Amino acid sequence: MMLHIALSVLSAATVLAPRSPSFAPPADDLPQLAWELKETGVTARLRGLSPVSRHVAWASGSEGTVLRTTDGGRSWQNVPPPGTAALQFRDIEAFDARTAVALSIGEGTDSRVYRTEDGGRTWAETFRNDEPRAFYDCLAFFDHRHGLAMSDPVDGRFRILATEDGGRTWRVLPAEGMPEALPGEAGFAASGQCLVTAGGRHAWLASGGAGRARVFHSADRGRTWTVADTPVPAGDPARGVFGLAFRDPLHGLAVGGDYRPDQQSPSAAAVTRDGGITWRPAATPPSGYRSGVTWLPFPSFAAVAVGPGGSDVTWDGGRTWRTFNGGSFDTVACARDGSCWASGEQGRLARLRLE
């Protein structure tokens, strides 16, 4: 059964339910979710993902890979910018079947932004980092024109890059509006979700690697920021918040933990209901480290988190999670029409369906 149809029915069934952020339907009424793997023809690790609709989605990753489907995943075309086989496209933001903006990560000039307006047949390099200390991790857009990219700290503060023309041109925003970073603090370019947006002007960025795992918030499209601690594991370069998801300017989820396979990740998820001012640990967290998270378009209290160790779902706004799949994925995202995808190592791409 198509996921967007089934979840529409579930959403309608909850109209008369109590309006509580932690409300979830009875367990017997919950859909059983499953991933349907699709053949991509690549072996790259796909950490960038941007579904547009039931038919159109983009994904990106290592070896300069940029994939595009226009038939709901039945076929994928590899449409990378030429001469980029050595780059890692860890994030991609697509607007439609023809237009997308991709971020390659790395130190110095490896951090670049490319834009296509013809479905990947041609690309324009619109930004190349010339600061050797900068390392860009993630990219996010508020709308078709306004977007941000974030770099690990330079001179003690996270660096923010901004565009006002859909990624055609970029400028570094003044550092004065950004709080000071902690020693060792950085972002994780693991899922394209260390920087996210909601509500037209709000942005959040996630950090780790320091004594506290933190989330920064901007209400003015990246010009000024505040910061809050989270209960997600910290205190080591391998620990922190890896992925964020906000369904509106108030309700958000954070996932992470310790990415090393031999380490435990208790409290791997947290939830906020005040826009990131405060964060609370999930009462029943995911079963391990998770790098990606997304709200399901409907019902509003449902979300999915993924990582190398499996996938989890919450039906109560992030308070409790339960595992529904043991396969490895790095990131997960949904289109507005309800179609959801996950991607990861060895070219893995899957569509979320009812079992």
Residue ranges and their predicted role:
Residues 1-5:
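Positively charged n-region of N-terminal signal peptides that target proteins for export
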